[in-house]
Amino acid sequence: MIIMEDVTKTYTSGVPALNGINLHVQKGEFVFIVGKSGSGKSTLIKLLLKELDPTSGKIYVNKKYLNKLTRKKLPYLRRDIGVVFQDFRLLPDRNIYDNIAFAQKVVEAPNKKIKSRVLAMLSMVGLLDKYKSFPNELSGGE
């Protein structure tokens, strides 16, 4: 379970990345973080993986309060969160559809549900026509 309560992240340069974010993700739920360039997607993920600390607000993952989590416990936290990144973290021997479906197959989600979720997500980000493409056939932003 992931909970973000009134999370704000402002970089030292003064650039605000996130402002007052509230997010609740239940155990077993799949969430896709999509948005325009510069909208804070990467910052949000880095906060959840504790690569960054919030300027204000609270973050919990599996009832662990990230704001106080020690470096020693970080690997255990990160094992509990499945993240698919857009940059070079896709499986090169699988097409885009299979890359997106992979995590859901691991937790044995029903095939019918996997198909509908993957197609809906691809449609949402404008890549439905590229579902058979491999990672090396897409641009960095795709």
Where on the chain are the PLM-derived regions?
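Signature (C-motif/LSGGQ) region and adjacent switch/coupling loops
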Residues: T70, Y97, Y131-F134
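ABC ATPase NBD coupling module
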Residues: L66-G82, N111
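Conserved ABC ATPase signature
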Residues: F134-E142
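Helix-to-loop junction immediately C-terminal to a conserved catalytic motif
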Residues: L49
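The feature captures the beta-strand-to-loop junction immediately N-terminal to the Walker
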Residues: V34-K36
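Short coil-to-helix segment of the ABC ATPase nucleotide-binding domain corresponding to the Q-loop/switch region
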Residues: D93-A103
